[in-house]
Structure formats: C-alpha cells, structure tokens
Amino acid sequence: TAGSEYKTLLFQEDNSQSLNRDDGTTKNIRLIDKVHVHSNRLQVLHQFEEEGGSHPTRYDVTILVNGLPLVQIELKRRGVAIKEAFNQINRYQRDSFWAGSGLYEYAQIFIISNGTHTKYYSNTTRFKHIHEMEGRPATGRSKKSSDSFEFTSWWADGRNHVIADLTVFARTFLARHALLNILTRYCVFTAEHDLLVMRPYQIAATERILNRILISEYDPKKLGTPEAGGYVWHTTGSGKTLTSFKTAQLASNMDGVDKVLFVVDRKDLDYQTIQEYERFKKGAVNSNKSTKVLADQLASPDAKIIVRTIQ
C-alpha cells in the first residue's frame, strides 16, 4: 500500500522521472503527458497472468497508458453483485499488485461491472477499504471516510443521467479523450494522500465554466455580459468546493488568465474554503485579511488563486 501511495504521488505530482537503462545510460521520461494528452499511447491488455504473487492471478482487463497499468477493470457475469468485483480487486491488492516489478501499484482508477451496473473509483478508495477490513484506521483519516464500496461512483451524461450499462459506459468513460482527461485533469491527490476522482456532474460543471472563460477570451465583447458567466447548482454534500478548486486550478493555467479570484459571501466560508483548498493542495491558494494584502496579491505574479469575502 505504501508503494501504491508513493507511485500515485509520482504520477499525480511529479511525473517526470529519470529512467536508468540496462546499458547504464539515463533518460528523462514523463509517465504521462498532461499538456498534449493525445500524445500518450493507450493499449488494452486482456487476461494478464501474474505468477509472482501470493497466489496465481489473472486480471480481466487492464488499460495501459505509456506502458503503465493505470486503469484496472474487473468484470463479473450479469446477475452477480458488482461488490464481488470490488472485493476481487481488494484481493488483487493483497495478493499480487505488488508482485513482479510492482507496476500494478500505478493503477489510479478501478472499474467494476456486471454488464448491467458499472461503477468507478480511485485507488485510495480501495486502499482505505483494505485497512477498514483489517480493523485499523487508514493513513490521514478515520475509517468512516472515503474508504468503502459506498464511495464508488456512477458515471453519467451531461444531464446527470446515470450510465450504468457497460457498453455505453465503455463508449463514453473509456473514450480516449475522456479517459485521458479524467486521468490528467479531473483527479486531485490531496495533502492527506487521498486520490479523488471527480464525479461526472463535477467534471461537467468544471468544463462548462472553463468553456465560458474561453468564449470571453476569444470574444472580448462578451466580457461582463451574461454570456460570459453563468450559474452552477450543486446540492449540499455534492462536492462544490472540489469543483471550484479544480476549476480555479485549471483556469489559472489557461493562456490569458492571470488571476483567479474566488469570492465567497461569508467570512466563515472564506476560512472553510481556504482549509479545504489547502487539503486539496498545500500552498495552492492565497488568503487575505485586508484590502492592502489583497491589492498586493493582485499585483503579484506569484498569487495565482486568491480567496476573498465579498465584504
């Protein structure tokens, strides 16, 4: 599990690595290209057999990205509960993901399906579930956090209609562009070493906000008009702060965007938002307690994301 956590950190935060070749030379490589996503190479591996684990293991379907097994799919027959697939991946982690070169510890996302029902979840959901079953708390949070089958996610379309059927799920979630975007843009590896894979409505909201920014960038006449803005409705507990954080992070890296100013309407929300942003990524956000500090931050090229109350 420590190996999986370390490899997730490498992949999410520091994916440029030095590769020591057999001939003694060294080559700098990127585990994945997050800027030009279509330059990454995808392959599908069926029924890979691992003989070096505690027991011989055969994985159903693995999606390799640049040779690394980043997505693992476990399939069950129709009529079999998909929780059986969840438990099967649990056993893989215990018995064989660490075997050989430990490459399966790079898996970021797991997909489970019985054909009729299909769900996805991050590697730390699985990791924390294992610790829960062993009766001891996982690193960073209590056992009652995102650590069990209940925290797996349904995929959905742009109107939030659930896509449960495996064939339709594969056509959408596993479409090359969609999958690469989820891996490179819509995951957050928190300061507590939780890997959060955004839910479909969070991804849809983020993409629509970024699209409005692009519209304003290409047509300055729309700046300050309703066409350049919009509303996003999320219910209580749906992850609004994660949506806003990822939107701010992606927007701050866009051409033509110098600052992202996140305005909240109450002081307690200011503190709460900053705390949550800090949990998602240490040092990612700049807070302020006076107009002078705000002015300094607006003038500074280093303060990319600023949180401020409306008062």
Across the structure, where does each feature detected by a protein language model lie?
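Inter-Walker segment of RecA-like/P-loop motor cores
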Residues: 278-311
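Alpha-helix N-cap recognition
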Residues: 265-266, 290
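ATP-dependent helicase/translocase motor core
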Residues: 1-259, 268-283, 301-304
